[in-house]
Amino acid sequence: MTHSVEDIKSTSRRLRGSLEQSLADPVTGALREDDQTLIKYHGSYQQDDRDIRDERRRQKLEPAYQFMIRTRTPGGVISPSQWLALDGIATRYANHSLRITTRQAFQFHGVIKRELKATMQAINATLIDTLAACGDVNRNVQVAANPLLSQAHATLYADAARVSEHLLPNTRAYYEIWLDEERVSGSGAEDEPIYGDRYLPRKFKIGFAAPPHNDVDVFANDLGFIAILREGQLLGYNVSIGGGMGASHGDAETWPRVANVIGFVTGDQLLDIATAVVTTQRDLGNRAVRKRARFKYTIDDHGLDTIVAEIERRAGFSLQPAQPFAFAHNGDRYGWVEGEQGDWHLTLSLPAGRIADTDTAAHLSGLRAIAQLQMGEFRMTPNQNLVIAGVPAEQRAQIDQLVAQYGLDAGNLAPTALARGAMACVALPTCGLAMAEAERYLPDFSAALQPLLERHGLAQTPIVLRLSGCPNGCSRPYLAEIALVGKAPGRYNLMLGGDRRGQRLNTLYRENINEADILAALEPLLARYAAERDRHTDEGFGDFLHRSGLIALPPYPTHRHLDLELLA
């Protein structure tokens, strides 16, 4: 019998369900149906290898079930020792690769059921957990990875960690099932004051940004905190609400949305405002229609003013007026930069965040060698790259030697700026929602687009490119200047017109087309951009498309771009 997600949550005994029985069942590599929903709250998804699904069906075998495990790492900061431990877990239990997500977490792929508990225990032994990395709860909290702002980053990271801990589910189910903690007894032992019996209507995402860099794409988050810095001092945060990328093909009732900036709070008000926003969504969000359950739809259905008033009522204070701020771009700075305190930070480009040893590069081995130096810290970026942070000046040469030896500089030296700034979700073969390739197709599509860029003198012009295997938008494609959103195998919707600052949604330009048609559609647009762009302002491709009238703002009945008055 199939149960609704809401029923599964409310009857789960605080996310326990029958997970222990499912894990102990030796007959199948899968979990029971309801437990496949509940395990998400513990940080894992049941998947199968879709590349061999048909072959196994012909052999009358069940699918090659496996599990993805995602870490909860607020701000994506870990120590070298933790990196080495996670490397070992990937090698022993997963598919010999690590993957950096667009929310600064790690994903392990290919873990089989009988090794799931051992893998979870190994992750927790590193002082990292996976609780609430998935499911209808607050997910991993993003933090700006800008290596130049050492002191500000430390403050943002601490604030993000506070918010992450505050919004964790209170249930002890995770610790009982995976870490063999003694069972909880007593009726009041596990109250969920923030989430309640049914948790949230849908997933919830929070990001901390530090202008002028918007690497977290803060306006794609349900709740955003934009640091207001004056002469290096953090005054507090502007608050944004209602961002979200997910949509459904051909469904006019769903759409992506950029967030609204609603006011300003001080650091000591963070937990109160976060609680107020999350509980407002808990109580007002749409639980009847799951595709309409994200906070963005709650705002659009009830009205922004109504939602802000409710947030202020729950918080017990009124928001102050938003402070001026300005974003310059949403990408990463590659190579070495010197921090405020005289140490150095190296940002490495890791295509689609995949860290593995391949025929062309040994990224997993190379980063293992760097971690063995035991210096600084590792920061995952929201663009799926990696910062080796806090390196003493005298150690730079040693790291440079390892970077070159293991091919870790290949991404930084990519032939096009487009390749350096591209993102893609995992998609096939493991994601059950994927309609087309994304991560595996990214290198081929970038290579196919390169001759067009070179022909028009654009090889070193930054253009934000993102690929998504389905319309749910994990790679934040709807903010990209060029995006491919999977529609069917080998076919994509071509989306154009986002900007380099993560402040404007793109729009559908061509629907359900193949690579040849995509390139044919882009060729004349790139030619005009090369000839007519405003070089004095370093006009971006998406900005040019709008200024020239080649595309228009998307027809979504929602918030499409940031109110530019706030950027004064």
UniProtKB/Swiss-Prot annotation:
InterPro entries assigned: CysI, NiRdtase/SiRdtase_haem-b_fer, Nit/Sulf_reduc_fer-like_dom_sf, NO2/SO3_Rdtase_4Fe4S_dom, NO2/SO3_Rdtase_4Fe4S_prot, NO2/SO3_Rdtase_4Fe4S_sf, NO2/SO3_Rdtase_FeS/sirohaem_BS
Name the chemical reaction catalysed here.
hydrogen sulfide + 3 NADP(+) + 3 H2O = sulfite + 3 NADPH + 4 H(+)
Pfam name, any one: NIR_SIR
Q: Name one GO molecular function term.
A: metal ion binding
User: Single GO cellular component annotation?
Assistant: sulfite reductase complex (NADPH)
HAMAP family referenced in this protein's UniProt entry, alphabetically:
CysI (MF_01540)
User: Could you tell me what this protein does?
Assistant: Component of the sulfite reductase complex that catalyzes the 6-electron reduction of sulfite to sulfide. This is one of several activities required for the biosynthesis of L-cysteine from sulfate.
The protein's name is: Sulfite reductase [NADPH] hemoprotein beta-component
Q: Which organism is it from?
A: Xanthomonas campestris pv. campestris (strain B100)
